[in-house]
UniProtKB/Swiss-Prot annotation:
PANTHER family: 10 KDA HEAT SHOCK PROTEIN (PTHR10772), CO-CHAPERONIN GROES (PTHR10772:SF58)
GO cellular-component term (any): cytoplasm
Protein's GO biological process: chaperone cofactor-dependent protein refolding
Name of the protein in question: Co-chaperonin GroES
Organism: Stenotrophomonas maltophilia (strain R551-3)
Assigned protein family: Belongs to the GroES chaperonin family.
Top-rank taxon, per record: Bacteria
GO molecular function: ATP binding; metal ion binding; protein folding chaperone; protein-folding chaperone binding; unfolded protein binding
A Pfam family annotated for this UniProt entry: Cpn10
Record SUPFAM superfamilies: GroES-like
The encoding gene: groES
Function: Together with the chaperonin GroEL, plays an essential role in assisting protein folding. The GroEL-GroES system forms a nano-cage that allows encapsulation of the non-native substrate proteins and provides a physical environment optimized to promote and accelerate protein folding. GroES binds to the apical surface of the GroEL ring, thereby capping the opening of the GroEL channel.
Ranges in a coiled coil: none
Length: 95
């Protein structure tokens, strides 16, 4: 993948949800919810501020994150789906 996000944007590769429920039931693709967890694969240089400086991003490549279900834009490259999000759309970093 060759994508470089601008400003305070990050590229996230969604982590697929389990195909089998905790009770052992196989979940078909049509019943799966969109993933809201992912791994950061690219980070922009930071958010430009009014005074001309740039606020450095708080996320880094490799971080596992949770983001809003409808946040960002989808991007597909070589059969893999990615999400391009603003850093503000990321709700939390996982462990």
């Amino acid at each position: 993948m060759s994508i470089k996000p601008l400003h305070d944007r990050v590229v996230v590769k969604p982590i697929e949800a389990d195909e089998i429920s905790a009770g052992g039931i196989v979940i078909p693709d049509s019943a799966k919810e969109k993933s809201t967890k992912g791994e950061v694969v690219a980070v922009g240089p930071g958010k430009p501020l009014d005074n001309g400086s740039v606020r450095a991003p708080s996320l880094k490549v490799g971080d596992k994150v949770i983001y809003g279900q409808y946040a960002g834009s989808s991007y597909k490259s070589e059969g893999v789906e990615y999400k391009v999000l603003r850093e503000d759309d990321v709700l939390a970093v996982i462990g």
